[in-house]
Amino acid sequence: MKVGRTTNALLAFALVGLLFGCASRPTNVLLPVADTSPSSSKVEMLVATTRARSANPAEMYTGERGSAPSFADITVSIPPASVRKVGEVAWPKKLPSNPATDFAVVKAEELTRDGAKEWLHASVKKSPDHSVLVFIHGFNNRFEDSVYRFAQIAKDTGTDSAPILVTWPSRGSTLAYGYDRESTNYTRDALETLFQYLAHDPEVKEVSILAHSMGNWLALESLRQMAIRNGGLPAKFKNVMLAAPDVDVDVFRTQIADMGKQHPQFTLFVSQDDRALKVSRRVWGNIPRLGSIDPEQAPYKEELASNNVVVIDLTKVKSGDSLNHGKFASSPQIVQLIGTRMAGGQSLTDSRVGLGDTIVQATTGAAAAAGSAAGLVISAPVAMVDQNTRENYGNEVESLTGSQSSKKTNAGSKNCNLPVAPTKGCKK
C-alpha cells in the first residue's frame, strides 16, 4: 500500500495533539547497566524478532527487515512504586540509566535457536500453570519501545506467565505506515511458526496472546494461517486480547470464521473516540476499524455474540491520551480494578466498576475462566500506547511543515521465519 502526501498530512494532523508538553528523551537505551538497585523489580523476557540487527549494541535491532530471525534474552529493571505510577514507563532522562529511578536493561544477550528453546523451557517451568504470554506491539514502535512497554505490562499485571515479546520491523515513524503494515505481513509466517512450536511443546500448557493496534493484524493473520493448516487451533490457546485493533472489520469477520468454532476466547477493547483509528479508517477507504466500532449496534452486536467475543467498550472512559488510542495507559486505576475483579473470577459489568466512567461488556457470558488466566484477559493491556514515543511524532510533523527533522534512516535487509524446531504442521 502506498501512503501519499495527503495521508501523511492526515496522520500528522491527528497526532499533533501529542506534541504539547512533550519532552524528548535519550534513545538507544538498551546497553546493560549494573544492577545497583535492590528495591527494583526485574522482568525477564524472551524476544523473537524479524528486525535486522544493529551495529550499535545500545539499539540492538533496527526498524529494517532481517534476513533471518533473531532471539534475545533481555532483563529489564523496573524502579519501585515510590517513583513510578502503574501504567508508566520511567524512561531515563539521561544515560546511562539509573535502575533506582528508570527502566534499565541489566541483561541483553542474543540467543541461538537452541538457546531460545532452553530459555523458554526453563521459564515455563517457573510458571505455576506452565503458561506463556505473547505480546505483539503496534505501529510506530522502535525496538526499545516494545521492550520497555512489554516489561511494564508484565510488571503491572503481575503475570506469572513466561513473557515472549514478538517484535516486527517498525521504523518508529508516523510516515512509515505503509512500510509498517507490510512488515506485519512479512512477519506473518514467522509468527505462525512460533505459534506452531508453542502448540507442540508439551511443557507449555496454556498460551495467551496480547496484541495492540496494527499488531492485531499480524496476530489474527498468523492464527488464521495456523487454523487453516492444522484444521483448527489448539485448545491450549486460551486467550487472545485485541487492544484497539487497527483491522478492517469485514476482514476480521472472515478471519475469525476461518479459525473455526473452536477458537480461543477473544476479548476486544474498543473506543469509538479513538482518533488514531479514525485516521486509519480514512486511509483504508472509509471501512470501519475493529477497535472503534459501536458494539451495541447491528450487525456487530449479534456477530460478536455469536462468536463469543467479549467486548470492553471504553468510549466513556476519560483519558489523558489525546488520541484515545491507549486509554489503559492514562487510566491505570481502571486497569487495576478490572484486574482485581477478574483475578477473583468475577464477571465484569458496569455496576461492578463503580466509577463515574462506564465500561460496557457488550456480549453475553463471563469474560473468561476464573483464576489467573481470567485476570490476565482484562488486566494485561495496562498501557497499550507508549506515551514516550511522542518525540517521533514531532520529528515527522516538522518534516511535513518544512522544519528540519532529526529522523535517521536505517539500513536493512530481507526475509525471515522464526526457526523453531519444525513439527507436524510447521514448515521447514
Region annotations inferred by a language model:
Residues 405-428:
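Long, low-complexity, intrinsically disordered segments
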Residues 141-146:
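Short substrate-entry loop that stabilizes the transition state in hydrolases
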Residues 134-138, 212, 244:
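The conserved beta1-alpha1 loop
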Residues 23, 27-110, 117-121, 126-127, ...:
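Lipolytic serine-hydrolase domain surface
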